[in-house]
Amino acid sequence: LQQTLEQFVNDRQWTNLQFRKNERIVCNFNITVSKYDKDQNIFTCKALIQANRPVYNSAYTSTLYNNVDENFTFKFAEFDQLAFTEERIDNQLTALLAYYAYLIIGLDLDSFAPKGGEDILQRCMNLTNNAQNFDFPGWKAFSDNRNRFAIISDYLDGAMEPFRMLQYNYYRKGLDEMANNVERGRTEITNT
């Protein structure tokens, strides 16, 4: 399962943007299985999802995203092939992985340009809307204020624009600037 998940996330091109290997986002999915129904091949899990962003001209990274998904539940059998199309969401596991891939890429792009991840985050929202039919928890609108729907819906809400700008100012104008001018970077972080 681990190898299948790694291949699915790392071998797929999630956007049309071109990145070098060293520009890839470092993220971790720490999935803890609490129950396995072998008759139906259903894994009941929780997942700690973390993503780090490199700081320009340094060996340092900063945490971009850190969240526990208490409802990381999916169906998987040993030789299942993971296939994903945005237009038709029919597999819980690929939907989960795609959701977090789009969310993390969108957050990362937001940290490099003001609302730079808007298009990718909209794709994440579309995926979430298309996943409303799943019988698995974590997708339903308004069922929980910390589920996947709530996270992406709230992040795209216009009221969150100041927070999104704060992310950009903190990372791009603050941390990244410190390689060129420590004082200016520190000032920008203090002002955010």
Regions picked out by a protein language model, each given a short descriptive name:
Residues 1-44, 55-57:
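Start-of-domain marker
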